[in-house]
């Protein structure tokens, strides 16, 4: 019984921490994880085939990539 109560308390704490993060901050975290740079103009080599504004990314070199329309 104590284990069940402890599990419920832990899950409530985790849920409250998740809900405490605003949606806008969550989106910013997601975009930064993709490696997008400011103003949706550039993306780095680790961002994959998409940029923040859903434009395609053309690699100019390993370190410099430009988002295309």
From Swiss-Prot:
Residues recorded as bearing Leucine amide in the entry: 68
N-terminal signal peptide: 1-20
Keywords from the UniProt entry: Amidation, Disulfide bond, Knottin, Neurotoxin, Secreted, Signal, Toxin
Keyword Aminoacyl-tRNA synthetase: no
GO cellular component: extracellular region
Localization annotation: Secreted
Tissue: Expressed by the venom gland.
Full protein name: U2-agatoxin-Ao1i
Organism (species): Agelena orientalis (Funnel-web spider)
Lineage: Eukaryota, Metazoa, Ecdysozoa, Arthropoda, Chelicerata
């Amino acid at each position: 019984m104590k284990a069940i109560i402890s599990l419920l308390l832990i899950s409530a704490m985790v849920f409250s921490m998740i809900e405490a993060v605003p949606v806008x901050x969550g989106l910013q975290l997601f975009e930064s994880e993709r490696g997008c740079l400011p103003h949706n103009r550039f993306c780095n080599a680790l961002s994959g085939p998409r940029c923040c504004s859903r434009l395609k990314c053309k690699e100019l070199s390993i370190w410099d990539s430009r988002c295309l329309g």
